[in-house]
Amino acid sequence: MSSVTMRQMLEAGVHFGHQTRYWNPKMAPFIFGERNKIHIINLEQTLPLFNDAMNYLGKLAGNGGKILFVGTKRSARDTIAEEALRCKMPYVNHRWLGGMLTNFKTVRESIRRLKDLELMREDGTFNRLSKKEALMRTRELEKLERSLGGIKDMNGLPDAMFVIDVGYEKIAVKEANKLGIPVIAVVDTNNSIEGVDYVIPGNDDAMRAIQLYVSAAADAIANAQVTSRATAAPAGDDEFVEVREGAEASKKKATVKKKAAPRAASGESAEAAAE
């Protein structure tokens, strides 16, 4: 379970929705009331839903799943990149390119081009080009890095997608829905919960609120990864012992063979192994 409390949510402004005139009726069950023509989100509903979402992310990460972090609006960009890198997950924090998931084969070609350009920069190829060519390659590299840098090591479709602001990232959500990829998302009062598997009702504009959501998600993933590695460690030790015992048995068998007659060797080695 997440360690985030209701007080922390209040302090981060998670409960502040949008102006009442922009509300989406499908968010009605999560609205507590209104103040100064601003909808107030019911944190008594948000907190358990938030915990469910974090638990799901943790279980998925513990089983080796990949979670794609998506937040391209200005207030979310830096936090998305920092926290996704911290828990070693892919991310998109600039403009979502149409087909980034549904046409991933083509995107892979662009990623390959990005890696080629990075290699050219590192091995000094750029320095051997004319100024004009070097500038063109540098600009191409920067453009690809900005749009694809966060997913260049993803190697395949993600197992889930964590989204800040489903309205702003509606194309990403649609692509995930089309491919059957679960969506965990922060949904404000002006957006619909359709297409979202794990809804987190909350403010999707305030930087402090965004930092709270994303850092908690990264914590859940990182903690699950550590626990998974710790649980897997004893299994590795057992396997090593079995190999060592097998080697000793083979050595014992070889010794018996050397002493015994050829016809009796197999029987005596079996008895030695049984002992």
Curated annotation (Swiss-Prot):
GO terms for cellular component: cytosolic small ribosomal subunit. SUPFAM superfamilies: Ribosomal protein S2 (SSF52313). The lineage of its organism: Bacteria, Pseudomonadati, Pseudomonadota, Gammaproteobacteria, Chromatiales. Belongs to the universal ribosomal protein uS2 family. Residues 244-275 are annotated as: Disordered. NCBIfam families: rpsB_bact. It comes from Thioalkalivibrio sulfidiphilus (strain HL-EbGR7). Residues 262-275 have a biased composition (Low complexity). Keywords: Ribonucleoprotein, Ribosomal protein. One of its GO terms (biological process) is translation. GO terms for molecular function: structural constituent of ribosome. This is Small ribosomal subunit protein uS2. PROSITE patterns: RIBOSOMAL_S2_1 (PS00962), RIBOSOMAL_S2_2 (PS00963). Residues 252-261 have a biased composition (Basic residues). It holds the Pfam family Ribosomal_S2. InterPro entries: Ribosomal_uS2, Ribosomal_uS2_bac/mit/plastid, Ribosomal_uS2_CS, Ribosomal_uS2_flav_dom_sf.
